[in-house]
A protein has these predicted regions:
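Short hydrophobic "strand-cap" motifs at the C-terminus of beta-strands
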Residues: 33, 75-76, 100, 125-126, ...
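Gly/Ser/Thr-rich phosphate-binding loop
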Residues: 92-95, 120-124, 134-203, 212
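Conserved small/polar residues in nucleotide/adenosyl-binding loops
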Residues: 1-2, 6-16, 36
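Conserved adenylation A10 loop of the ANL superfamily
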Residues: 33-46
Length: 383
């Protein structure tokens, strides 16, 4: 009996301590620090606060229609902020999240078998994980039997591969999510509600509640509809900045240039976007991926879109070797490089044709499943 009383006393003490901590907690206090390297390869600790995370959970739960019957399959490692979209809503609703063995993402048939075995009905994966399934014609052998919500993000979904998914699961909802870690992971969404041409890009749509997207030009002025500007985020989704790095924080968390009346921070994402004729936000590319080549300004993403349109191509990645002044294209597909280049000459102007083209057996991926552009850049420089 004595140990039981001691345990009870310890529990009471812990409860009081926890209550005291919660009672002093502010919604602007840090809740976690997650390290991200983005496109630079240099880790930065992003400090999120309770307010931004709570708002994120509410918005994501509404968009993906979470409830206690949601059966989620986790794709990203738990040390990436992307896993939060699975863990927090699961806790909020008493839903279920299954941790998918990392090795299965190398074997698409076994991956779909896992989804069926555990009756997974919702996924929120990076595009590379989804295209790996469709590009290897997995659906000819096995289909996900329970999936009704497929959310994706972090990369542009090639329309050709998206069509395969939608034709395979015609009753499912497909949702494109967009947002940087500095905006608590995701801050925009678009539910795919129509067919797209192969040369189109799926919109990132509209911002979450309590968030606004500003498209600013180089002079910090709003761009006109249809023009490209830097995607800047304002609102509750903003994190607190970079841990112990005030210099870097002040570079991208800046005073709203459209507001000269009181202090208000916005986050400059480094992404370029525009609004289409429907008023939907379109992701164009990273500023890092916009290059000057042969006297022309080029979006590397535009090259990738045209490559991915080709029937025999599964996926591609274009990088720029600035030192040598060459565009290098890496791809997975059935075509040989010389045949691919001949096709591209009918699709692209001469200055956008890759100087080097290399066929890969497998696309290198980062730990969270995205195409590893930093690795491919180094590979191109070593050629």
């Amino acid at each position: 009996e004595i140990p039981l009383r001691l345990v009870g006393s310890e529990m009471c003490i812990r409860d009081r301590l926890l209550f005291g901590i919660r009672d002093r907690q502010l919604d602007t206090d840090p809740i976690y620090i997650v390290f991200t390297s983005g496109s630079t390869g240099v880790p930065k600790g992003v400090v999120a606060c309770h307010r931004s995370v709570i708002d994120y959970i509410e918005n994501l739960s509404e968009v993906l229609r979470f409830n206690e019957n949601t059966r989620f399959a986790n794709q990203t490692p738990l040390y990436f902020d992307a896993c939060l979209k699975e863990l927090y809503p699961t806790l909020k609703f008493g839903a279920t999240t299954y941790i998918v063995p990392k090795s299965l993402f190398m074997f698409p048939i076994k991956l779909v078998e896992f989804l069926n075995e555990y009756k997974i009905n919702t996924v929120c994966w990076v595009v590379s994980a989804l295209t790996m399934i469709s590009a290897f014609k997995t659906f000819n052998k096995i289909k996900p039997e329970y999936l009704h919500t497929i959310a994706f993000g972090s990369e542009v979904f090639p329309i050709k591969q998206l069509k395969i998914w939608r034709e395979t699961l015609p009753k499912a909802r497909f949702v494109n999510l967009y947002g940087p870690t500095e905006a608590t992971g995701m801050c925009c969404y678009f539910e795919v509600d129509r067919e797209f041409e192969l040369d189109e890009v799926v919109p990132i749509g509209r911002p979450f509640h309590n968030t606004e997207i500003l498209l600013l030009d180089e002079n910090n002025k709003l761009v006109e509809d249809g023009n490209v500007g830097e995607i800047c985020v304002r609102g509750t989704s903003l994190t607190l900045g970079y841990y112990n790095n005030f210099e870097k924080t002040s570079e991208v968390f800046v005073q709203n240039p459209l507001n000269s009346r009181y202090p208000e921070l916005i986050y400059k994402t480094g992404d370029l976007g525009k609004r289409n004729e429907r008023g939907e936000l379109i992701f164009v590319s990273r500023k890092d991926y916009q290059i000057k080549h042969m006297g022309h300004r080029i979006e590397l993403g535009e090259i990738e879109v045209n490559v991915n349109m080709i029937e025999e191509i599964s996926t591609s990645c274009a990088v720029y070797d600035k030192e040598k002044g060459k565009i290098v294209l890496y791809y997975i597909g059935e075509l040989e490089p010389d045949k691919l280049v001949r096709i591209l000459k009918d699709k692209l102007p001469r200055y956008m044709i890759p100087n080097k083209t290399e066929k890969l057996e497998q696309m290198p991926l980062t730990a969270n499943g995205k195409i590893d552009r930093v690795f491919l850049m180094k590979k191109a420089q070593e050629r």
